């Protein structure tokens, strides 16, 4: 287990640790239970090594793995909140940290399951629950999230939002988080190495375009099929990378994060204050800026009419290439 980054809690802001968790090879419920124990052990050991730690982040699929033959079975799914999240909550309370965790969630309405992330605070309370808005189709079978993009208070003056893996490839997701007040966007991922460059690029662009910190971490290691790249990354609100991990399983990537600086940039910048300028175009020529929406895709998406010009020619529109049956009905 190695580490990259800072070791101390700043006077203002907070210290975070991103855990490059080794990709779990999970075949049974007993394997999931073992991963939960390992995650809890990691919370306690990381807090012991970094006493000033306030936020610890685990990647997507760290709890239940990526066994695609079983990942939607009743045996593998969890209820949120439920016994598993209760164990995470107890660990966060004991170690006095905020924790970000990945759960493949049983659908309470009996439909397809969700890919879910939660934040638990140092009092052991679940303060945020997010369901992945953009499953990585056609590989993933998860139902598209229905909880929007919530924001919660975090350590050191932070306003936290979480997105999951493929979500971060959509600039609209990061913009939604910022628009709702987030100054720190956490991205938990289970990508294999094919998209590592794009993952790092979008972590930086999401930070820069929205004047917010991004804290991102991926699974690491080999599961017998794919290699997962780790590479925990903390980006400053100006889009520069503050800390970058390597490809080592169990590497701990730490950083001091100063949300107040992002807040100050949003209030004080003129040039490149793009999160504000989007809704106040040309305010020098037009006092207050032009407010009308000029974007066709925004209008069409809002009206449920989004369609790209080449849509009728797109070849892959269902999950059959990965063995999923074509659904007879479209679930809203």
UniProtKB/Swiss-Prot annotation:
GO biological process: putrescine biosynthetic process from arginine
The entry's keywords: Hydrolase
Pfam short name (any one): CN_hydrolase
Catalytic site positions: 60, 132, 165
GO molecular function, one term: N-carbamoylputrescine amidase activity
Keyword flag Hydrolase: yes
Gene3D superfamilies reported for this sequence: Carbon-nitrogen hydrolase
Residue ranges of every copy of the CN hydrolase domain listed in the record: 14-259
Record's catalysed reaction(s): formamide + H2O = formate + NH4(+)
InterPro entries to which the protein is assigned, alphabetical: Aliph_Amidase/BUP, C-N_Hydrolase, C-N_Hydrolase_sf, Formamidase
Enzyme Commission number(s) from the entry: 3.5.1.49
Family recorded in the similarity comment: Belongs to the carbon-nitrogen hydrolase superfamily. Aliphatic amidase family.
Function: Is an aliphatic amidase with a restricted substrate specificity, as it only hydrolyzes formamide.
Protein name: Formamidase
């Amino acid at each position: 287990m190695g580490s990259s980054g800072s070791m101390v809690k700043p006077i203002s802001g907070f210290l975070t640790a991103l855990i490059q968790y080794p990709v779990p090879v999970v075949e049974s419920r007993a394997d999931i239970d073992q991963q939960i124990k390992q995650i809890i052990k990691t919370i306690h050991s990381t807090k012991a090594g970094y006493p000033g730690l306030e936020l610890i982040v685990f990647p997507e699929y760290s709890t239940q793995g990526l066994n695609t033959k079983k990942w939607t079975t009743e045996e593998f799914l969890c209820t949120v909140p439920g016994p598993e999240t209760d164990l995470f909550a107890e660990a966060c309370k004991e170690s006095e940290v905020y924790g970000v965790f990945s759960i493949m969630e049983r659908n309470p309405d009996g439909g397809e399951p969700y890919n879910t992330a939660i934040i638990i605070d140092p009092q052991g309370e679940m303060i945020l629950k997010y369901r992945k808005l953009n499953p990585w189709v056609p590989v993933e079978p998860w139902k598209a999230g229905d909880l929007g993009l919530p924001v919660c208070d975090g350590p050191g003056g932070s306003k936290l939002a979480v997105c999951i893996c493929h979500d971060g490839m959509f600039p609209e997701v990061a913009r939604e988080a910022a628009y709702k007040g987030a100054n720190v966007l956490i991205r938990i991922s289970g990508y294999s190495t094919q998209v590592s460059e794009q993952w790092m690029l979008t972590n930086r662009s999401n930070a820069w375009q929205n004047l917010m910190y991004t804290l991102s971490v991926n699974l690491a290691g080999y599961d017998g099929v794919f290699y997962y790249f780790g590479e925990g990354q903390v980006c400053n609100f100006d889009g520069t990378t503050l800390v970058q991990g390597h490809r080592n399983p169990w590497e701990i990537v730490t950083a001091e994060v100063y949300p107040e600086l992002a807040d100050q940039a949003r209030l004080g910048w003129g040039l490149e204050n793009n999160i504000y300028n989007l809704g106040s175009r040309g305010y020098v020529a037009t006092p207050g800026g032009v407010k009308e929406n000029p974007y066709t895709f925004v209008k069409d998406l809002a009206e449920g009419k989004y369609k790209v010009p080449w849509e009728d020619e797109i070849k892959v529109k269902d999950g059959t290439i990965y063995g999923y049956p074509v659904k007879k009905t479209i679930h809203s």
